[in-house]
From Swiss-Prot:
PROSITE patterns according to UniProt: AA_TRNA_LIGASE_II_ALA (PS50860)
Annotated CDD domains: AlaRS_core
Keyword Coiled coil: no
Reactions the enzyme catalyzes: tRNA(Ala) + L-alanine + ATP = L-alanyl-tRNA(Ala) + AMP + diphosphate
Organism in which the protein naturally occurs: Staphylococcus epidermidis (strain ATCC 35984 / DSM 28319 / BCRC 17069 / CCUG 31568 / BM 3577 / RP62A)
Domain notes: Consists of three domains; the N-terminal catalytic domain, the editing domain and the C-terminal C-Ala domain. The editing domain removes incorrectly charged amino acids, while the C-Ala domain, along with tRNA(Ala), serves as a bridge to cooperatively bring together the editing and aminoacylation centers thus stimulating deacylation of misacylated tRNAs.
UniProt KW Oxidoreductase keyword: no
Pfam families to which the protein is assigned, alphabetical: DHHA1, tRNA-synt_2c, tRNA_SAD
Name of the protein described by the UniProt record: Alanine--tRNA ligase
Amino acid sequence: MKKMKASEIRQKYLDFFVEKGHMIEPSAPLVPIDDDSLLWINSGVATLKKYFDGRETPKKPRIVNSQKAIRTNDIENVGFTARHHTFFEMLGNFSIGDYFKHEAIEFAWEFLTSDKWMGMEPEKLYVTIHPEDTEAFRIWHEDIGLEESRIIRIEGNFWDIGEGPSGPNTEIFYDRGSAYGKDDPAEEMYPGGENERYLEVWNLVFSEFNHNKDNTYTPLPNKNIDTGMGLERMTSISQNVRTNYETDLFMPIIKEVEHVSGKKYLIDDAQDVAFKVIADHIRTISFAIADGALPANEGRGYVLRRLLRRAVRFSQSLGINEPFMYKLVDIVADIMEPYYPNVKDKSNFIKRVIKSEEERFHETLEEGLTILNELIKEAKNSDQVIKGHDAFKLYDTYGFPIELTEELATQENLSVDMPTFEQEMQQQRDRARQARQNSQSMQVQSEVLKNIQDESQFVGYETTDYQSLITHIIYNGEEVKHVEAGETIYFILRETPFYAVSGGQVADKGTVGNESFEINVTDVTKAPNGQNLHKGIVQFGEATQNAKVEARVNKEDRRLIQKNHSATHLLHAALKEVLGDHVNQAGSLVEPERLRFDFSHFGPMTQEEINLVERRVNEEIWRAIDVRIQEMSIEEAKSIGAMALFGEKYGDIVRVVNMAPFSIELCGGIHVNNTAEIGLFKIVSESGTGAGVRRIEALTGKGAFLHLEEIETQFNNIKNHLKVKSDNQVVEKVKQLQEEEKGLLKQLEQRNKEITSLKMGNIEEQVELINNLKVLATEVEIPNPKAIRSTMDDFKSKLQDTIIVLVGQVDGKVSVIATVPKSLTNQVKAGDLIKNMTPIIGGKGGGRPDMAQGGGTQPEKITEALRFIKDYIKNL
């Protein structure tokens, strides 16, 4: 067999099937587009569902791809086995109603055994088939010439996921030889068994039946082929290494981890797990971020965060206790660049996101471990179980992974109350799901809508008023002829000027009706077959199917939306110009009142950057650029520099919104005719929505003017209160007042210290010796809650070897602070003192072993709390 690089195997596979008349389907982003059923693209066929289910017809019925994929259903196995991965590449060839079993098997055999391609030894190949698939057996045995002894019948060789296409499959195995195990059926040492000797290299699925609702199977009118070959596994065979991790896809990463850690791979089995986890997870994280995912606390973002934190935990077992994962991104980019340039193109952004996450997790670990250690102590003193509520709070409030809580609890021979934890998690999911319920409300109607094939033409680019016809009315999930006033309905027009919500632009609102009835249109979405689906309330009369109507869009709202949408394009271009090409749209909202734009950028924008972006947008508005809308081929659009939104799928003909030379972007939305119509652009806020994502909210036109007018009014009020005449004097006057306040506060603080000192007398005389420890636990007078910290500083300077606990009250609120000399923290911890004391005063608190703070709401319990401190130390 030929020894080849992974990149060579990938290219040979694609070249082979192109020779066989296949069309290359480019690898799709890992974040699914328009497929809510998937968290990630998890297979080669996942991106081709549109062809298999008939939604789209491919240019050619023969397709080949190398699709990057993520599977996270068994994360905990990654690192402990030879071939488990969260990120992998699936090579696949597919036939949509074209060739079938004979060609699929012949193609596979030729690619594997021909010297021109993989050059595998035929005698090392075995296959499995379904026992009843006599056709596959005949092809393998008679046409290919495979001995009957190398064709194994296995009942499980049938691809079936329930209702829908299904069929038998044949798997091809490579025998790596007796070095990987002697033949022994008792140990499953045979093709298809759980062993390291016979490796599955290719799975050919023959979709020839439809699995019906009544669990019967009927032949499909169009039979399909769906195959999959794991690139990592094939590479390990070609390079003759024991596991996928020793291939050129992983070893450069592992070599760098060796360099950073000073440890060696393949010396210690437990240590090897850490190397594998890091090498696998950094590939997944790098590609996922490059494809638009970002670490977060839910959904795919949580998967990324979990993977990164798992890798960091394993890196600590190699002695790496600082952020370093981000340094591996360039290595991943170099390995994968021949076919996936995206990681290298976005490497700086990816590294910044990962580094920030690593830094935050190291902080989280430190803080979370302190809290977890207290929970472990409590569990040991009670029922040996960490409460589910506490574990959830640790996860939800501090971001401490539940997996790590379980792991550390197990090390202490404790368990975690997971049922309660899961119950808390489910309640959190339920809260999140409430926000999504509206988007699912049409599922009842969807079966009706699927059957509506009539076209509905959108005429809203040219007009806001149009004479049309109601072709369909849906009420309570059923298609009806008439609906009375007061009811909410969904309906379709033969032609409509109403824009359906899309690309961040909200739907048009307005009215549809005639002399007999009127419908107030409140929303417009896309129906399953592409028509604009209007939602509205019948205002008067009886809405009737096939009625001729006047469709009128709210013109004022439309005009404001146009301004905000065109301004969004200018904003996007300005952000790229000012911040860099890594900026990509991560979400947008264009509505009449304002615009909101989410974009990928690491860290808050400076005020200077915000001002510059705002100025650039306004400059393009004042240049009065004609906005040209053109339809052209995707290739032509790219040639003129049109910006496409990352991850979006575009057809052969695209709509280009051209504000050249500043902004050229693919877009289906509605825009102004000239940028001067926008009038004015004003950013009102810049904030973060998650790791690596920033959000700008802005106003245009009249809204921007009114906002500035309000600011000017407030400024003039401030000027009047400050009693200054010139605008330029305002800042100087404020600075003067701030300095005066600072001086007065210092004087007040000094006076309070003097008063406290006089009242306290000689504080050294108040120190008690408790359990051979010097202790001062007392109440002090403070003017405000913050003053207790400065009071403590004074006490500490005089009593450096003393445990000090101070309590003060202001307006019925209690403030507590404790310090313990670092030399004594092995005996008593400030955090423990505060944590156990504050419940007495109706509060809570905590902190480090040497310093902690807290508060409460029951000043009448201060004496009791101070007595508790002394008793606590006495009983240590």
